[in-house]
Swiss-Prot record:
Main location per the UniProt record: plastid
Any one GO molecular function term: RNA binding
PANTHER family documented for this protein: MATURASE K
Protein name stated in the entry: Maturase K
BP GO annotations: mRNA processing; RNA splicing; tRNA processing
Localisation per UniProt entry: Plastid, Chloroplast
Annotated Gene Ontology cellular component terms: chloroplast
Similarity annotation: Belongs to the intron maturase 2 family. MatK subfamily.
Species, as recorded: Mimosa pudica (Sensitive plant)
Protein's job: Usually encoded in the trnK tRNA gene intron. Probably assists in splicing its own and other chloroplast group II introns.
One family name in Pfam for this protein: Intron_maturas2
InterPro entries: Domain_X, Maturase_MatK, Maturase_MatK_N
Length: 506
């Protein structure tokens, strides 16, 4: 990214609106091929026929401008600006160009903010999705109610573009972005709005991911403001926030008005013990106070989505539960607050008393049924959890087959090592181990028992169960007692940045 900052500063110095000219820069598309963006959609299978031409990109952009979008006719669905070219490839290239360009100012701003806050060294640990669980273990045992929230998707891509317009002042760039989205919707006019946005997210993952993340960031920034000023808000006062520009321009004035003019009529709900966590499109809001406050926030969320983002969400999509009686699902774990009872003997002079102490602990367990469902979908077992052979891998060498199974088992063990109960984790390892043996036996056209007896592979396959112990022994080489204690306790690895396909079964 640093090697392109010189070009960006040059383009920025020439004119105020600097995003639009980047569309026609060769190095922007070269950036998509660099190692920094190796997750690009069109990088994976780049052959001779798929080598892009900047001249063709310019021609396609010109064609989008030349179409008259003010006149809608029956033949509009037949018009295709990508006619004569590789439609999917150049659609992805232009989408990738939009994504890269719009990421640049936010990436530079984010990098500078990290350096200013002096948290660059700890940034890698903060990025881990498992860094949230130590926070939950520390805070949630003292809370009583949890609200399970699924953030709704916008019904139209235009909503995502409008949100971004308030932060990036470049009218030509967004006009071209709208033309691109219009052409996409025009080519998929047979789809409903909900299916259309789902199709766009699959065919243009990078651009959609950026727009959606920005939408979530915007929603959370408004929520944090409401949380900070919650003692001055009532549900019937929410109508003053309808106009979004007015909201940002006058929010400080509104707070002063609330405090001065409505202090005698407002009902104050102060809740210092309220916590909010989110991963992807799901969030958890937990509080210690009565469910009345949680219901208040529930209606705030619904009105926020409807008024600011034109997203319809029914009250039934937000579930309020009691932590001691219900569990919530987050990042592949089921979590709930469990009561631990212990009896302490106390003696005073000649009298002995038994004192019962009740403490709360956050219980985090592996959801065995969803994982077995994911393993069955990947053809490692059937729906009942009985291991089966992975026939599609039978053409590989024995070493490759064992290595593939070991990597899957290692990743799942690494991810779920924070579980309170390891019995479910051992069952998953057993399924993968037996599936590996059956795959090898299928390859050699033998039974499982005959294959193990002939090849002596039983000791090699013990790695499925010894991998975790070897890692812990490297961390604590001399403390065997410590190793035994840690073997039954939770360990969170802060190098996990995302969940794999078998874990992501929502």
């Amino acid at each position: 990214m640093k090697e392109y900052q010189v070009y960006l500063e040059r383009d920025r110095s020439r004119q105020q609106d600097f995003l639009y000219p980047l569309i026609f820069r060769e190095y922007v598309y070269g950036l998509a091929y660099s190692h920094d963006f190796n997750r690009s959609t069109f990088v994976e299978n780049v052959g001779y026929d798929n080598k892009y031409s900047l001249l063709i990109v310019k021609r396609l952009i010109t064609r989008m401008y030349q179409q008259n979008h003010l006149i809608i006719s029956a033949n509009d669905s037949k018009k295709n600006p990508f006619l004569g070219y590789n439609k999917n490839f150049y659609s992805q290239i232009i989408s990738e160009g939009f994504a890269i360009i719009v990421e640049i100012p936010f990436f530079l701003q984010f990098s500078s903010s990290l350096e200013a806050a002096e948290i660059v060294k700890s940034y890698k640990n903060l990025r881990s999705i498992h860094s949230i669980f130590p926070f939950l273990e520390d805070k949630f045992p003292y809370l009583n109610y949890v609200s399970d929230i699924r953030i709704p998707y916008p019904i139209h891509l235009e909503i995502l573009v409008q949100i971004l317009r308030y932060w990036v002042k470049d009218a030509p760039f967004f006009h071209l972005l709208r033309l691109f989205l219009y052409n996409f919707c025009n080519r998929n006019s047979f789809l409903t709005p909900k299916k259309s946005i789902s199709t766009f997210s699959k065919s243009n993952p990078r651009l959609f991911l950026f727009l959606y993340n920005f939408y979530v960031c915007e929603y959370e920034s408004i929520f944090l403001f409401l949380r900070k000023k919650s003692s001055h808000l009532r549900l019937k006062s929410f109508s003053v926030f309808f106009e979004r520009i007015f909201f940002y321009a006058k929010r400080e004035h509104l707070v002063e008005v609330f405090a001065k003019d409505f202090s005698s009529t407002l009902t104050f709900f102060k809740d210092p013990l309220i916590h909010y966590v989110r991963y992807q499109g799901k969030s958890i809001l937990a509080s210690k106070n009565a469910p009345l406050l949680m219901n208040k926030w529930k209606h705030y969320f619904i009105h926020l989505w409807e008024c600011f983002f034109d997203v319809w969400s029914q009250p039934g999509t937000i579930h309020i539960k009691q932590l001691s009686e219900h569990s919530f699902y987050l990042l592949g774990y089921f979590s709930n607050v469990r009561l631990n009872r212990s009896v302490v003997r106390s003696q005073m002079v000649q009298n002995t008393f038994l004192i019962e102490i009740v403490s709360k602990k956050l219980d985090i367990i592996v959801p065995i049924i969803p994982i077995i469902r994911s393993l069955a979908k990947a053809k490692f077992c059937n729906v009942l959890g009985h291991p089966i052979s992975k026939a599609v891998w039978a053409d590989s060498s024995d070493f490759d087959i064992i290595d593939r199974f070991l990597r899957i088992c290692r990743n799942i063990s690494h991810y779920y090592n924070g579980s309170s109960k390891k019995k479910s984790l051992y069952r998953i390892k057993y399924i993968l181990r037996l599936s590996c043996i059956k795959t090898l036996a299928c390859k050699h056209k033998s039974t499982v028992r005959a294959f193990l007896k002939r090849s002596g592979s039983e000791e090699l396959l013990e790695e499925f169960f010894t991998e975790e112990e070897e890692i812990l022994s490297l961390i604590f080489p001399r403390a065997s007692s410590t190793l035994q204690k840690l073997h039954g306790n939770r360990i969170w690895y802060l190098d996990i940045l995302f969940s794999n396909d078998l874990v992501n079964h929502e």
